[in-house]
Design a protein with these regions (language model features):
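Positively charged, low-complexity intrinsically disordered leader regions
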Residues: 1-61
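Short, glycine-rich nucleotide/cofactor-binding loops
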Residues: 37-39, 61-62, 66-83
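Short loop/turn segments at strand-loop or loop-helix junctions that form parts
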Residues: 64-69, 164-168, 209
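Histidine-anchored nucleotide/phosphate-binding helix
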Residues: 77-96
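Short internal beta-strands
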Residues: 98-106
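Short, charged/polar "capping" segments at the starts of alpha-helices
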Residues: 107-113, 214
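An acidic, phosphate/nucleotide-engaging active-site surface
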Residues: 113-202
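A structural signal for small-residue-enriched, beta-sheet-centric alpha/beta enzyme cores
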Residues: 190-198, 203-222
Length: 222
């Protein structure tokens, strides 16, 4: 291991440990982290950043999945929407890529508000995404329509990356649950089916690691 590799490793671990601070004693994040780092074999921030730099290409689409709907309010939690919109701007600025945010309809208003703060434009035309623009696609909550919409979206071209950030995922029985075990299947967008795309795309699932990967990938020389 040379000096550069050692520096990457150490900074990667530092970012991981920073993001895993647990002031309230929740504990779950560290359990998940232990499993994830066994899988990657390296700091999650480093793994994510290297994947972003390697796979995201100028002018190509990057799918960003976000928007966990919460009961009883039937609204999306805010951390995923805000951080994903910031990430979309990062994709534009760092790589010149075309971010496509696939979200439940409840997210659209917040994304538009964030876009004004960030100085980016919004479009709904997935075939024509101008520079400095985020494309919004509202994804179905109807399981019987998920495959049809997935194929329609992919007919416009494959993405170079699929990023899932604070987004729900179904269990082996096809159900979605929130953090306290309540079944939320009927209210969640079914976009996690895009994680099964059979193509040579980079698929990464992020939560707090989004911040780690974003900071690291800014270096661009890794």
């Amino acid at each position: 291991m040379n000096k550069t590799e050692l520096t990457k490793l150490n900074v990667g671990y530092n970012l991981d440990w920073l993001m895993n601070l647990d002031p309230r004693g929740y504990g779950v994040c560290r359990i998940l982290y232990d499993g994830a780092i066994k899988y990657t074999g390296k700091p999650l921030s480093l793994n994510g950043a290297e994947g972003l730099v390697k796979n995201i290409k100028k002018g190509e689409k990057v799918f960003i999945l976000t928007g966990f709907i919460l009961l009883p309010w039937n609204e999306a939690e805010t951390d995923g929407i805000i951080s994903s919109t910031v990430f979309a701007r990062f994709v534009i600025r760092a790589f010149g890529a075309k971010p496509v945010m696939l979200v439940p309809e409840q997210c659209e208003k917040a994304i538009k508000a964030m876009s004004e703060v960030l100085g980016v434009d919004i479009t709904y035309d997935i075939d024509n995404i101008p520079d400095n623009t985020i494309c919004i696609v509202s994804f179905t909550k109807d399981k019987s329509k998920e495959e049809e919409q997935t194929q329609e979206i992919l007919s416009h071209g494959l993405p170079c990356a699929v990023i899932s950030n604070e987004a729900p995922g179904r269990n082996k029985n096809g159900y979605y649950h929130n953090a306290v075990g309540v079944n939320t299947t009927d209210i969640e967008a079914k976009y996690d089916v895009l994680g099964n795309v059979k193509a040579e795309v980079f698929i990464i699932f992020l939560s707090v690691t989004l911040a780690m990967s974003l900071v690291w990938a800014l270096l661009k020389n890794i």
